[in-house]
Amino acid sequence: MKLNPNDVVIIDAVRSPMGKTKNGVFRNVRAENLSAALVKELFKRNPNVDQKDVEDLIWGCVNQTLEQGFNMARAVSLLAGLPITCAAQTVNRLCGSSMSAIHTAAQAIMTGQGDVFVVGGVEHMGHVGMMHGVDVNPALSKHMAKASMMMGVTAEMLGKMHGVSREDQDAFAVRSHRLAHEATLQGRFNNEIVSIEGHDADGNKILVEVDEVIRPETSMESLAKLAPVFMPKVGTVTAGTSSALSDGASAMLMMSAKKAEELGLTPIAKVRSMAVAGCDPAIMGYGPVPATKKALKRAGLTIADIDIVELNEAFAAQSIPVLKDLGLLDLVDDKVNLNGGAIALGHPLGCSGTRISTTLLNVMREKDATVGLATMCIGMGQGIATVFERV
C-alpha cells in the first residue's frame, strides 16, 4: 500500500500485564512508573527513533488525582527519560481517554503539527478508586437520572431493552476468560506485554510477565452461583459478567508516514478513520454503535469490510446489544475479541483505549487481516471508535 506523507501510522504498541486491583501484583507500583516503563520499552524496541523528535506525550487517565493528578503525563515523560523539550498532556474522556489520545495525536500529524508522538494511558484503580473525589453537580438531575452514573445499572437497562438473558451474559463471560487464557498459554500476548516488576502475595519482588486477572476456571456453573451485583433480586448483571477491576497501562508510538519512511521504519498499520459520538447516558454502553457507524462512513466502509474487531467488554449485557446492532453477533467467533476482552483482562479505565487497539493490531498481524475496528463505550453516554488498516 502506498502511503501519503501525512498518513498517521502506528510504529509499535505495548501494554503492561493487567494486575488485580485488590492486593494485586502492582499494589506497590505507582501509576506513573507503570506508564514510564512502557515508554522506555517503546524506544528500546525502536532505537532508530530520536527521542528529541517527540512532539508530545499524550496520556489518558480518568481519575486525575493523587498520584494520577497534576498532569501526570509530564511526570511520565520525565520518568521515562524523554528530553525536557518533549511536551506532555493528560487527557480525559473517561473510558475512552487513551483512544482520545490516539485521536489527538493523529489529528496533529494530519495537520502538520508534529511528526512523532507517544500516546497511551493508565489507571491504577487500586491506588485511586474510580469515584475518589467525584462531586457530581446536582443540576445534572434535570438532564439524566442519577442511576446513569452507575455503570452497572445502565448495563442492566440496555440488556433488558434488548432481551439479553442471564445465560447469554454468562456464556459471553466464559468465552472471554477462555480465549484470554488460551492466548496466554499460546504466547499470543507476548509481543504486546512488557514485563514489569511487581510483588507476589508474600511481598517478594517478581517480574510480572502475564495478566493476573484472567480466571481460567470460570464456567457457566460457577457464574450461575453469583448474585446480581447492581440490582439485587431483579437484575442479571453480576461481578462475573462485568469487566474486572484492574491496574494497568498501555502505550503506542505514532508518527507521520513521511517520518517513518525517513527513519526506515515499517509501520504496523495506519489510522484509517476516527469518530466519537454521544448517546443517552442511561444506556451509555450503546455508545460504540453510533461511534462505529460514523467511523465506517468516514472510511468509506461497511461493517462487512472489517476483518477483526476489539470491543471493550464493559459488561456482557452491554456488549451483546452493541454486537447485535452492528451486525456482528453471528460473527463473534470469527471476528470479535479473539483473545478475550475486558471481562477477563480488566478495564483500567484510562488504559483501555490503547490496550484494545494494541491487542487489535497484534490479532490483525496474527490473522493477516487488513482492516480492524477498536471501539468502546464511555460513561455518561458516549462512544469512541478507530478504524486501523495494516500497511
UniProtKB/Swiss-Prot annotation:
* Entry-linked Gene3D superfamilies: 3.40.47.10
Reading the lineage from the top rank, the first entry is Bacteria
Which Pfam families does the UniProt record give?
Thiolase_C, Thiolase_N
EC primary class? transferase
- One BP term from GO: fatty acid beta-oxidation
- Subunit composition? Heterotetramer of two alpha chains (FadB) and two beta chains (FadA).
Membership in a protein family: Belongs to the thiolase-like superfamily. Thiolase family.
- Main role? Catalyzes the final step of fatty acid oxidation in which acetyl-CoA is released and the CoA ester of a fatty acid two carbons shorter is formed.
Q: What is this protein called?
A: 3-ketoacyl-CoA thiolase
**Origin organism of this chain?**
Marinomonas sp. (strain MWYL1)
